[in-house]
């Protein structure tokens, strides 16, 4: 999972916000507020606390799923074992970061590093900004495992639970862990980036957490991960395509291998939601519509390097401009999931469920119209911003 940024919410990108912000509702039995610094605060260092997240998190709805729904997920454990765990690869059959990097035990190690650095010199700064952002997002993996373990009915209750849901979460995390490791080592060897600034950004991001608006609900949680895995598949696929265009076949293979993992994970998560539509269509379509109205909050939305409070917007804008992850990709994912889960064909829904169905089926065309208008308004605008990750060199947004 990991990567992604909200390609449709950034002012820097001059792209529209296509959905309503999250609202607290009386249907939720519990609410919580995380107290943080307002996003406009200038000095984190002035605080007496050793760490305070630099971004403000609004009121959060928690445990919105009715308790009796937990039984649905318990009843699906046998199904998950036979249909979801099969999408994991045995460790011995998985690629490892060392497969793509210079071998420090070989006599040609220094020459291999030199060749890697020579290839990296031909790649533009804007690409490295996006690749660094992708890597940082992957490195915040502990946050995503934490998020999955907030979901009622599927969390790992002990840290070593043998339920299929818990086994999946741990093994998924283990597979994903290779992604950040590989990109981190590549970037370190490339000599093109400021690793200390990148490492600070990773620490800030993990410390800040994330706010996916999933309300501890596995319905919402698995819709979120279905979207995210497809988005990361697209994004890593596009960084691989660009690396090939720049003549770095090794980097293209790195990105392509990560994208392949993301595709396999996407298949597993979308199968879970497909099963939920089969056995509980009303609750599932309501959860899907709710997540779309609140927007998919990207894992890196709290990204911060100690300097730039708009770093997420700036990073997202560069990714949009060079075609790694765009507003079009966002709407394509929405349309894909509506089709994949056969939302138009749902029958026997409640009145509220039918409204959610209508909303979801009309959403892609509405977003496309808004995107077209936003792109027209953005014509001719070419702002730039420095990025600490590349030694404060400026890049077009």
UniProtKB/Swiss-Prot annotation:
InterPro entries: FADS-2_CS, Fatty_acid_desaturase-2, Ferritin-like_SF, RNR-like. PANTHER family: ACYL- ACYL-CARRIER-PROTEIN DESATURASE-RELATED, STEAROYL-[ACYL-CARRIER-PROTEIN] 9-DESATURASE 7, CHLOROPLASTIC. Keywords: Chloroplast, Fatty acid biosynthesis, Fatty acid metabolism, Iron, Lipid biosynthesis, Lipid metabolism, Metal-binding, Oxidoreductase, Plastid, Transit peptide. It comes from Gossypium hirsutum. Its EC number is 1.14.19.2. This is Stearoyl-[acyl-carrier-protein] 9-desaturase, chloroplastic. GO terms for biological process: defense response; fatty acid biosynthetic process; fatty acid metabolic process. Homodimer. Fe cation 2 binds at residues 176, 229, 262, 265. Fe cation 1 binds at residues 138, 176, 179, 262. It is found in: Plastid, Chloroplast; Plastid. The keyword Plastid applies. Pfam families: FA_desaturase_2. Pathway: Lipid metabolism; fatty acid metabolism. Residues 1-33 form a transit peptide. It catalyses: octadecanoyl-[ACP] + 2 reduced [2Fe-2S]-[ferredoxin] + O2 + 2 H(+) = (9Z)-octadecenoyl-[ACP] + 2 oxidized [2Fe-2S]-[ferredoxin] + 2 H2O. Binds 2 Fe(2+) ions per subunit. Belongs to the fatty acid desaturase type 2 family. GO terms for molecular function: metal ion binding; stearoyl-[ACP] desaturase activity; stearoyl-CoA 9-desaturase activity. Its cofactor is Fe(2+). It is an enzyme of class 1 (oxidoreductase). It comes from the Eukaryota. Converts stearoyl-ACP to oleoyl-ACP by introduction of a cis double bond between carbons 9 and 10 of the acyl chain. The keyword Cell inner membrane does not apply. GO terms for cellular component: chloroplast.
């Amino acid at each position: 999972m990991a990567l992604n940024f909200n390609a449709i919410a950034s002012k820097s990108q001059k792209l529209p916000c296509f959905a309503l912000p999250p609202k607290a509702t009386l249907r939720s039995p519990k609410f919580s507020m995380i107290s943080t610094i307002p996003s406009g605060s200038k000095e984190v260092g002035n605080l007496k606390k050793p760490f305070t997240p630099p971004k403000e998190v609004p009121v959060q709805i928690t445990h919105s799923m009715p308790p009796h729904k937990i039984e649905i997920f318990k009843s699906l454990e046998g199904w998950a074992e036979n249909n979801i765990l099969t999408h994991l690869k045995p460790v011995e059959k998985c690629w490892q970061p060392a497969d793509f990097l210079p071998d420090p035990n070989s006599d040609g190690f220094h020459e291999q590093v030199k060749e890697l650095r020579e290839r990296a010199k031909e790649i533009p700064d804007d690409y490295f900004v996006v690749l660094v952002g992708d890597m940082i997002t992957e490195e915040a993996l502990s946050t995503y495992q934490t998020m999955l373990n907030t979901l009622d009915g599927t969390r790992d209750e002990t840290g070593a639970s043998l339920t299929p849901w818990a086994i999946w979460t741990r093994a998924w995390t283990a597979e994903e862990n290779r992604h950040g490791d590989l990109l981190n080592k590549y970037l370190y060897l490339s000599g093109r980036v400021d690793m200390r600034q990148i490492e600070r950004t990773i620490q800030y991001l993990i410390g800040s957490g994330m706010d996916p608006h999933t309300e501890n609900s596995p319905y919402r949680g698995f819709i979120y991960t279905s979207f995210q895995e497809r988005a990361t598949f697209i994004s890593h696929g596009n960084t691989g395509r660009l690396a090939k265009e720049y003549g770095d076949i090794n980097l293209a293979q790195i990105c392509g291998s990560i994208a392949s993992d993301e595709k396999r994970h996407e298949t597993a998560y979308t199968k879970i939601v497909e099963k939920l539509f089969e056995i509980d269509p009303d609750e599932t379509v309501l959860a899907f519509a709710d997540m779309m109205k609140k927007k998919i909050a990207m894992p890196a939305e709290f990204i911060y390097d100690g300097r730039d409070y708009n770093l997420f917007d700036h990073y997202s804008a560069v990714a949009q401009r060079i075609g790694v992850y765009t507003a079009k990709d966002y709407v394509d994912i929405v349309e894909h999931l509506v089709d994949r889960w056969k939302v138009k064909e749902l029958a026997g829904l409640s009145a509220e469920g039918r409204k959610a169905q209508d909303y979801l089926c009309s959403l892609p065309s509405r977003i496309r119209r808004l995107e077209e208008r936003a792109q027209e308004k953005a014509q001719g605008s070419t702002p730039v911003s420095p990025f600490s990750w590349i030694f404060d060199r400026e890049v077009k947004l």
